[in-house]
Amino acid sequence: SRSTPVAGAAIAMAARKIHAKAKKIAAHLLEVSESDLDWEIDRFKVRGNEDQFKTMADIAFAAYQQPPEGLEPGLEAVHYYDPPNFTYPFGIYLCVVDIDKGTGESSIRRFYALDDCGTRINPMIIDGQIHGGLTEGFAVAMGQQMPFDEQGNLLGNTLMDYFLPTAVETPAWETDYTVTPSPHHPIGAK
């Protein structure tokens, strides 16, 4: 999907702005320097004092009720992302096919796929997208088509005539990945 390389970058940059403002507010509330704070999941903690912290809920409330002098009230950000260059995932694929010399029938014995989509944000979704893409490619390779007559009329206009592979026809994909973060994306996604 192309949503992470574009929208994901804008979200990451806006989140960084919110994080920076939240840190200023936490430092103000805790009466310490920003450099004395460490971030931990949902809170800023004073380094060396585990009991002195402010949660994001505390900070969000303070952002609207008692922001530090010079800071605009609120805890929100907008960022428009214009990528300096495009990012694309890539992969390598190997298909082992058996072909019956007499009939020409083919069957896929094994299919290996190695993909690199940069920083993996949500592995379950990525695996689903890879399997979906492989299945679509498999369908086209195995004869999926939309035939038209000479007048441009669609001949195969029902799913009875259109090859959509099911779990029965689809091979068991053997997938793996490597991660090479994109230098053109704030979180390395491709």
Q: What is the predicted function of each stretch?
A:
Residues S1-K190:
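C-terminal catalytic domains of large/alpha subunits in multi-subunit enzymes
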